[in-house]
Amino acid sequence: MSMRTEYCGLVTEHLLGQTVSLCGWVQRRRDHGGVIFIDLRDREGLVQVVCDPDRAEMFATAEGVRNEFCVQVKGLVRNRPEGTVNAGLKSGKIEVLCHELNVLNPSITPPFQLDDDNLSETTRLTHRVLDLRRPQMQHNLRLRYRVAIEARKYLDEQGFIDIETPMLTKSTPEGARDYLVPSRVNAGQFFALPQSPQLFKQLLMVANFDRYYQITKCFRDEDLRADRQPEFTQIDCETSFLGEQEIRDLFEDMIRHIFKTTINVELDAKFPVMPYSEAMARFGSDKPDLRVKLEFTELTDAMKDVDFKVFSTPANAKDGRVAALRVPKGAELSRGDIDGYTEFVRIYGAKGLAWIKVNEKAKGRDGLQSPIVKNLHDASIAAILERTGAEDGDIIFFAADRAKVVNDSLGALRLKIGHSEFGKANGLVEAGWKPLWVVDFPMFEYDDEDARYVAAHHPFTSPKDEHLEYLESDPGRCLAKAYDMVLNGWEIGGGSVRIHREDVQSKVFRALKIGAEEAQAKFGFLLDALQYGAPPHGGIAFGLDRIVTMMAGADSIRDVIAFPKTQRAQDLLTQAPSPVDERQLRELHIRLRQPEQPAS
């Protein structure tokens, strides 16, 4: 008999009466009055092994095994005694009567129990190998595998070709810092790890491969946020001779296919499409969570002439905004709740949080409860009540500041209230999946510090055809042929139609204050390629880590990556990054300069 004939978790009634050979890890050992029970675990699940003292040598071995010993069991599959069936296990109707037990490798005492759900992330990442043995992590990584397989199946059927692009490439400005790799052969010069395969996949379209994809690692040396990793995985795609709508349709179908085949979820037959300007106006975010039913009400124009400077000053400012958020039944919120929300919005730059409780709308001013009502005239109060559609028992929150602060703070408050226990109890948030496309993004953003425009996405995104004329005269008016797929408030994919004409690409570089000499030095290979009959093309990249996190219901993308980094970009398992010896540095012609310590 071979070392293993079956997986533990797949031993069921169909094997009754058969002798099997199993390999796995001891989940738990129990001694019940002379009979030893072992819960044996492998990647497919658990099976109960019964060790009877009638087989003395085997029983002596069983007495010595402990949690996480790696063992081999040979035995007979039989029904469990009446009353001992475990309906929670796939193998719960049977057990294996052990004939032979071999310890393949003992284990020292693990630093934690695998069923402990209260472990710190530091402990889990330091002992990642043991953490990965836990059923939830096994499930997550197998789900990740299935998502990747289904993406490949779909793309293969659609005629896409899997082509690898370089990991050592040229450093080009794409927003975040590059991870640099020194060249030993070319002293003083550096490769960069790719932030994305963006330029290479465009070159593949010029080279007539028509449809490309790869599931690939990307690298960004940026300040990490809660769900960012210095290295992450993209489902990266590019296609020729398709317009924006056709590209969106193609990849919308892919996401529907993946969700249906991996977690049996039917996404909307047609994803709604929302312009960027509408998303910002209604939700203060370019990735709105449509499960939350709350929306902004625009009040900027109505507050320009009020005596209340907190509202009128931003209402009259060039970059100011005044917006309201009506919360149905919110009048029941306590002053403590409101104070908590006030502190919360300060995180996003808000100076405070104005509010009005609507107790009896019919009484006008007298039916309102708020510290700000006395500062507003009747016409402005009427405008607030009419525009928000407020009813008795509602509360209205206000934000008045620079538009960015209003959008960030009130948008975060919208999500916090919607997903709170209050929000759930009052039907302010729906369950399920709410996908949408956000389109018509600004092509450029103005950088006040550098006094110039920067690319909102990347400098290879095509402007809308009707906005080509603004590239040189008024870049701020340009909208891009860019699109993001958003799901439950997460951007899971983003892409665009690309610039395929050299003259347009050069105009975009000039709008970004990238001169001809700099453009040639950094992007000459692209500009040259575009002159050889480059086809119209576009594409998209999906964040595999993020998609799997959502599907798994995980708390963090670190729960769906086998060996992730911490928020400080450290690998606690291998202790990377780490110093290297002086000889290696000399070979690379590098001398370290330690960062200056701040004066005490």
UniProtKB/Swiss-Prot annotation:
The residues listed in the UniProt record as binding L-aspartate, with positions renumbered to this chain, are 174, 220, 457, 498
Reactions catalysed according to its record: tRNA(Asx) + L-aspartate + ATP = L-aspartyl-tRNA(Asx) + AMP + diphosphate
A Pfam family cross-referenced in the UniProt record is: tRNA-synt_2
Q: Which GO terms describe its biological process?
A: aspartyl-tRNA aminoacylation
Where it mainly occurs, coarsely classed, is cytoplasm
What would you give as a GO molecular function for this chain, any one?
A: aspartate-tRNA(Asn) ligase activity
Q: Which domain of life is it from?
A: Bacteria
> Which keywords does UniProt give here?
Aminoacyl-tRNA synthetase, ATP-binding, Cytoplasm, Ligase, Nucleotide-binding, Protein biosynthesis
Q: What class of enzyme is it?
A: ligase
This protein's record includes keyword Protein biosynthesis: yes
* Chain positions of site Important for tRNA non-discrimination: 32, 83
Q: Quick one: which residues bind ATP?
A: 220-222, 229, 491, 543-546
Q: What does this protein do?
A: Aspartyl-tRNA synthetase with relaxed tRNA specificity since it is able to aspartylate not only its cognate tRNA(Asp) but also tRNA(Asn). Reaction proceeds in two steps: L-aspartate is first activated by ATP to form Asp-AMP and then transferred to the acceptor end of tRNA(Asp/Asn).
Protein's name according to its UniProt entry: Aspartate--tRNA(Asp/Asn) ligase
Its gene is: aspS
